[in-house]
């Protein structure tokens, strides 16, 4: 190759780039911004728990990454060289030369802004046809994926190196967490009590922010494995050559794999996609997480005089919205919900079948050399009683090896359960006499029986290896894999209730009733539900709501009573929104009164997601918990009231400052209400991946929750692309789950210790900040003429809707371009692509400036940043969002707005607030540059960002072509494909969509 493609590297202690031929070249310039000389650099927003977030100067992980950065640079060099070879051989040297020209040119612009050079580069882009632009975009896109994989593998190696040498581990590790608990004086019995209360519950969603296809994820997994193998000690002479060749092969296959979906995924595709992370990483990761926690406990407490071991409960639980979330998605029906549950059921059964088969080959104990427990021997006799109904051959299998014999039967019973699930899925009849496991409790009983028996005759080591791993998997996943939440919008339920009551002649004008009368009537009807003789007479949507509840009951009976998580009511405004669902559930037998006893098999979670709703959450929850009938239903369902908080829509509604503060206060208020009424409140956090949608570092975000509100449990959504970043690789999944668990454990010590209340001065300052921030945000988004026209013209939000990345529409109402109609995901996605990440910071600068006019208040804000985790997380997360913005590039997107006055007004306000926010955050945090306190992330993002510049300018050119009314239809259609690829590429480069 005559030209070499250069790659940026992350986590370097010095600022340098690599020529992929191996030569070190000049330092990267300090980041400059043609619009603002104050900007020193630009970076991209961090993910909700990306690995580079564990960064403090004293952290061993940071030290290791800085010390061994040369290895990372070398690996990125190798991957870049291999990619260059693939581009040259598969696309031609002309493509490679174009990529190199753009790369070099835009890096030079970072060093010395030059309008003439910029126009020259734009002209180069403008002369390229859609067919010529496509491979250029793909080259940069694949580079980002390879560099990200190299970073991920590198960080895994550094953690492995730290663990191998012993001593202090990194922030968020089990060892660090247990050491802190021991130093707090937490006794072994207190530790056991604390762990019993811990529940860490990620909920996987199919929100359309995952722009990466499953086939791409699988290819990247192969690249990760080959890259990791390359670092293993060589066991044969040509070790390096073989794995380098493997990498080349996988990269070439990746080049030949289309990263853009040919069609929009349907819900069935999303259901199958949701299984990928369980099968690919989580089934293997979870036993490792529990094993590491157990060993860390022993290291911390073995010398404690009262320590006699610990019994680890099942602290990890998983949920899902995939196939259950029908809010705004007409493609999710009762049938797809049923299919989602059965698909999850079959997925986990097959995982158990595989692992039981493995145990058959592991637990080969002979009855001549061990004495199984009487209970275990009794279970073998029970198995023999099934002989005529099951398998004539089984008594002949392993007659002298009792555990293999038992496991063989268990495998048969699992396969029978699998066949039963397939029959349900296909709508075929099934013989109930076939003896398959009827639920997870039966299967778990047999596993524990084997373990107890083995321990009884001195085989504890073998009992606590692969067998214990399977027990822990079963306690985590049951027979359902992930508890499926059902979600629907509140007016669907109120309309359904009105329809039912009118059809039955109970109330002809339900909508006119006030809240008091509604609650009274609903309570009476739940106690004595009416009978619907003819559902066919009801409205179509009412019938569908009832069918969904029928499926809930059917699947609870068929698979597990735990198969459903909660029924989430979006846009909940009042207590009757919850009672509507309970009344409809009573019509299908899910709740009601039998004699004097109430029963309830469905928990409801109201979702508060606007600024007004968050402000009114206290009276709504209070009225709900005080409702006599609902109190009895709640007690029948375990006395746990889940309340969901919407980060995305509240931030879109009133801005990041008001949203963050109202969410914080809402948590405190509902927890207090629960304590007053003897009801446990579990908070469900509806967070997105970006800062503007509630994202941020997991461990720090958990610890930043209001003191005393976590109560051992946290449930939160894991949306879109976050899933692939966190759970595509086993090694990363282990890290992410560890960080989450330690965050919950550390933040839940209020269960065993008194917690210190917040300083009231901090609250008064936050009230002022929230008020000023919301006012500034609403002035821009609701009171500035033409703002929404600017949004739709100066961002690619309309074109994002053409990208096949999700089954749900990007707007709540077709053709409605209002702020309330556009979904929070599309709102954030559009601004991010145009490098104007205002949802994550707009209004904060004005708020800080208004408060800091008082010097004493500035001192208080600095103390808040130093001592209050909530405020520190708010400002740190905002820094990550700010450094992702590029006001010079944002200004070029602004030129897409056709109205000059609107363009100048709106962009002027955005740019001014950006400068203001950057200035005041630096003052409050007392830093010279943003992210000064996170040097690894700062360096990593500084290196990645120059490679986004060409992509943004390519996208700008394609947007102009695609939107130009004079462009012929055939040319417009030709521009669409590379335009969609540019959206994918920028999302990958920024590691962020919505």
Description of each model-found segment:
Residues 313-315, 319-321, 329, 471-472, ...:
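Beta-sheet entry/capping signal
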Residues 332-364, 588-775:
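Catalytic or ion-translocation cores adjacent to nucleophile or general acid/base/metal-coordination motifs
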Residues 48-523, 541, 602, 695, ...:
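Often metal-dependent polyanion-binding catalytic scaffolds in large enzymes
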Residues 213-225, 239-258, 436, 467, ...:
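Structured alpha-helical segments in the cores of large, soluble enzyme domains
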């Amino acid at each position: 190759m005559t030209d070499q493609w250069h790659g940026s590297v992350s986590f370097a202690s010095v600022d340098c780039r690599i020529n992929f031929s191996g030569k070190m070249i000049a330092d990267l310039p300090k980041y400059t911004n043609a619009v603002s000389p104050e900007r020193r650099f630009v970076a991209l927003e961090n993910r909700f728990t990306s690995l580079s977030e564990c960064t403090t100067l004293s952290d061993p992980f940071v030290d290791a990454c800085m010390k061994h950065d040369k290895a990372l640079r070398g690996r990125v060099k190798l991957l870049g060289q291999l990619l260059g070879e693939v581009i040259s051989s598969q696309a031609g040297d002309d493509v490679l030369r174009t990529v190199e020209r753009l790369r070099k040119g835009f890096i030079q612009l970072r060093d010395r802004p030059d309008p003439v050079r910029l126009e020259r580069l734009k002209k180069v882009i403008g002369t390229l046809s859609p067919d010529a632009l496509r491979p250029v975009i793909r080259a940069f896109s694949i580079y980002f994926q390879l560099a990200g994989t190299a970073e991920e593998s590198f960080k895994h190696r550094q953690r492995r190196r730290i663990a191998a040498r012993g001593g202090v581990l990194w922030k968020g590790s089990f060892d660090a967490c247990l050491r802190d608990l021991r130093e707090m004086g937490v006794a072994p019995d207190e530790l056991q009590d604390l762990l019993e209360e811990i529940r860490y519950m990620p909920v996987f969603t199919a929100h359309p922010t995952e722009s990466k296809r499953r086939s791409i994820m699988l290819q990247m997994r192969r690249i990760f494995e080959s890259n990791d193998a390359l670092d293993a000690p060589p066991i044969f002479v040509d070790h390096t050559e073989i794995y380098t060749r493997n990498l080349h092969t996988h990269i070439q296959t990746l080049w030949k794999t289309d990263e853009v979906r040919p069609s929009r995924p349907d819900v069935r595709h999303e259901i199958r996609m949701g299984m990928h992370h369980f099968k690919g990483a989580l089934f293997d990761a979870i036993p490792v997480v529990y094993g590491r926690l157990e060993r860390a406990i022993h290291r911390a407490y073995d010398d404690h005089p009262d320590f006699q071991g610990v019994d680890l409960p099942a602290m990890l639980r998983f949920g899902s919205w995939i196939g259950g979330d029908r809010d705004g998605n007409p493609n999710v029906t009762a049938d797809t919900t049923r299919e989602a549950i059965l698909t999850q059921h079959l997925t986990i059964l097959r995982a158990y079948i595989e692992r039981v088969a493995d145990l058959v080959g592991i637990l080969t104990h002979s009855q001549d050399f061990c004495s199984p427990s009487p209970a275990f021997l009794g279970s073998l006799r029970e198995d023999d009683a099934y002989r005529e109904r099951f398998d004539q051959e089984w008594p002949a299998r392993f007659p002298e090896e009792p555990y293999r014999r038992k496991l063989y039967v268990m495998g048969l019973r699992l396969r029978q359960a699998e066949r039963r699930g397939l029959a349900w899925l296909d709508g075929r009849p099934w013989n109930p006499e076939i003896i398959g496991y009827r639920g997870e409790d039966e299967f778990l009983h047999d596993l524990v029986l084997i373990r107890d028996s083995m321990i009884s005759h001195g085989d504890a080591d073998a009992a606590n290896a692969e067998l214990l791993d399977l027990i822990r998997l079963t306690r985590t996943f049951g027979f359902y894999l992930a508890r499926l939440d059902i979600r629907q919008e509140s007016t669907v339920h109120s309309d359904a209730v009105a329809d039912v009551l009118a059809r039955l002649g109970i109330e002809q004008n339900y909508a006119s009733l006030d809240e008091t009368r509604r609650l009274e009537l609903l309570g009476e009807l739940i106690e004595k539900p009416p009978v619907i003789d003819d559902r066919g007479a009801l409205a179509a949507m009412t019938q569908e709501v009832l069918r969904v509840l029928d499926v809930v009951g059917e699947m609870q009976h068929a698979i597990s009573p735990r198969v459903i998580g909660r029924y989430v009511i979006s846009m909940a405004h009042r207590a009757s929104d919850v009672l509507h669902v309970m009344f409809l559930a009573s019509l299908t037998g899910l709740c009601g009164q039998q004699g004097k006893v109430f029963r309830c098999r469905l928990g409801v979670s109201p979702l508060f997601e606007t600024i007004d709703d968050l402000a009114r959450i206290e009276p709504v929850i209070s009225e709900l918990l005080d409702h006599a009938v609902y109190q009895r239903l709640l007690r029948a369902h375990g006395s746990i009231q889940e309340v969901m908080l919407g980060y995305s829509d509240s931030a879109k509604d009133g801005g990041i400052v008001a949203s963050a503060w109202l969410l914080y206060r809402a948590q405190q208020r509902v927890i207090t209400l629960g304590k007053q009424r003897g009801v446990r409140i579990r908070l469900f956090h509806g967070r997105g991946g970006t800062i503007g949608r509630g994202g941020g570092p997991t461990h720090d975000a958990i610890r930043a929750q209001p003191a005393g509100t976590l109560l051992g449990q946290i449930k939160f959504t894991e949306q879109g692309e976050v899933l692939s970043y966190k759970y595509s690789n086993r090694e990363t999944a282990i890290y992410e789950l560890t960080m989450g668990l330690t965050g919950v454990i550390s933040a839940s010590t209020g269960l065993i210790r008194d917690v210190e209340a917040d300083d009231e001065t901090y609250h008064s300052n936050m009230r002022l900040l929230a008020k000023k921030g919301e006012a500034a945000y609403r002035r821009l988004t609701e009171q500035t003429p033409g703002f929404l026209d600017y949004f739709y013209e100066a961002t690619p939000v309309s074109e994002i809707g053409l990208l096949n990345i999700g089954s749900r529409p990007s707007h709540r109402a077709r053709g409605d371009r209002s702020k309330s109609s556009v979904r929070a995901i599309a709102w954030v996605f559009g601004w991010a692509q145009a490098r104007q990440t205002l949802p994550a910071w707009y209004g904060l600068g004005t708020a800080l400036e208004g408060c800091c006019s008082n010097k004493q208040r500035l001192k208080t804000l600095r103390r808040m940043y130093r001592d209050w985790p909530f405020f520190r997380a708010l400002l740190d997360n905002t820094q990550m969002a700010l450094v992702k913005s590029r006001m010079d590039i944002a200004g070029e997107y602004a030129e897409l707005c056709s109205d000059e006055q609107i363009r100048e007004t709106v962009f002027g306000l955005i740019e001014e607030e950006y400068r203001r926010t950057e200035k005041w955050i630096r003052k409050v945090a007392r830093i010279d540059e943003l992210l000064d306190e996170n040097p690894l992330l700062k360096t990593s993002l500084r290196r990645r960002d120059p490679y986004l510049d060409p992509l943004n300018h390519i996208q700008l050119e394609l947007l102009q072509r695609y939107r130009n009314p004079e462009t012929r239809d055939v040319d417009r259609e030709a521009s669409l494909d590379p335009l969609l690829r540019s959206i994918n590429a920028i999302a990958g480069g920024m590691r962020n969509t919505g």
